[in-house]
């Protein structure tokens, strides 16, 4: 029989830099999970993606064991890296803060495709383009 899931915890952590300090410690500690075991596994799995924030979904079982699934970095983080900017525009209607080209847009869409609710690359590109536009980043051909 499969183990019963007691909780599902969602966190967004720096790749390769998880430590027992908040937010990891309190979130896992209240469910009785071995915090250091999670930190070591997460850091080992994400060390090649340094510099990105990687969302993680942790399933905690009734025997206090856990499994976790890492997601792709948020689209906004990928767009800001591609455009070479610190952050998006506060008011996207008035100010453009950067530009990305179609090739960069397609690369981001390919990266995000497993986590998006899309079946093909064209619709994924439209989703990412909308996110970029809302951040004040224009897409050039």
UniProtKB/Swiss-Prot annotation:
Residue ranges that the Swiss-Prot or TrEMBL entry lists as coiled coil: none
Gene3D superfamilies, A to Z: Ribosomal protein L11, C-terminal domain (1.10.10.250), Ribosomal protein L11/L12, N-terminal domain (3.30.1550.10)
GO CC terms: cytosolic large ribosomal subunit
Any one GO molecular function term: large ribosomal subunit rRNA binding
Biological process according to GO: translation
Source species, domain of life: Bacteria
Keywords: Methylation, Ribonucleoprotein, Ribosomal protein, RNA-binding, rRNA-binding
SUPFAM superfamilies associated with the record: Ribosomal L11/L12e N-terminal domain, Ribosomal protein L11, C-terminal domain
Entries under HAMAP family matching the protein: Ribosomal_uL11
Function noted in UniProt: Forms part of the ribosomal stalk which helps the ribosome interact with GTP-bound translation factors.
UniProt similarity note: Belongs to the universal ribosomal protein uL11 family.
NCBIfam families: L11_bact
Protein name: Large ribosomal subunit protein uL11
């Amino acid at each position: 029989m499969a183990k019963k899931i007691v909780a599902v915890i969602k966190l967004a952590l720096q790749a390769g830099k998880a430590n027992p300090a908040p937010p990891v410690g309190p979130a896992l500690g209240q469910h009785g999970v071995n915090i250091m075991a999670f930190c070591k596994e997460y850091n080992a799995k994400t060390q090649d993606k340094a510099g990105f924030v990687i969302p993680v979904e942790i399933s905690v079982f009734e025997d206090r064991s856990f499994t976790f699934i890492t997601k792709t970095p948020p689209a906004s983080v990928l767009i800001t890296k591609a455009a070479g900017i610190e952050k998006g525009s506060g008011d996207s209607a008035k100010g453009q803060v950067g530009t990305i080209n179609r090739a960069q847009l397609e690369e981001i869409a390919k990266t995000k495709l497993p986590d998006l609710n899309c079946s093909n690359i064209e619709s994924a590109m439209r989703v990412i383009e909308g996110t970029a536009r809302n951040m004040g980043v224009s897409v050039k051909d």
